[in-house]
């Protein structure tokens, strides 16, 4: 099994269509395809940061998106994710951004989404059918408990 740490350059070129997840020590939280994860970050940047990547949520948008969240920054990351979750509730599902670098791109499923999805805070569902933000919080809590860095890795 080859593991590749994401960085913006590598991520966009090589890992976009691979399965990715959050890893803390030997705990792995599967997310889904890399383009799905990029969509979450794109949606946050476009809708909550006025398209200025990392301007409001630098720990998640800059540090973690590069591939690793230092254990010393986990509290800040948790607070940023709480704000993101709250603020995304104000946006309808049609405000999802699949790729901030190409706003014409749409999710593979188009507008065919579950009626349970009522806003952008519950739009993102992992490949295992779990709420993405819940899984994200679980990974951050594990990082805090174990005092080990969280990484984004492909399998």
Regions found by a protein language model. Give the residues of each.
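Acidic (Asp/Glu-rich) sequence patches and key acidic residues
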Residues: 2-138, 142-155
């Amino acid at each position: 099994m080859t593991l590749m740490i994401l960085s913006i350059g590598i991520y966009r070129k090589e890992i976009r269509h691979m399965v990715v997840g959050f890893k803390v020590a030997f705990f792995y939280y599967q997310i889904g395809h890399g383009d799905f994860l990029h969509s979450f970050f794109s949606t946050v940047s476009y809708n909550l940061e006025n398209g200025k990547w990392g301007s409001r949520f630098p720990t998640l948008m800059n540090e973690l998106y590069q591939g690793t969240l230092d254990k010393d920054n986990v509290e800040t990351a948790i607070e940023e994710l709480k704000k993101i979750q709250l603020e995304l509730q104000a946006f309808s599902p049609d405000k999802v951004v699949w790729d901030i670098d190409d706003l014409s791109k749409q999710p593979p499923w188009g507008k065919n989404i579950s009626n349970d999805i009522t806003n952008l805070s519950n739009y993102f569902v992992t490949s295992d059918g779990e709420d993405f933000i819940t899984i994200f919080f679980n990974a951050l809590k594990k990082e805090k408990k174990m005092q080990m860095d969280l990484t984004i890795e492909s399998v």
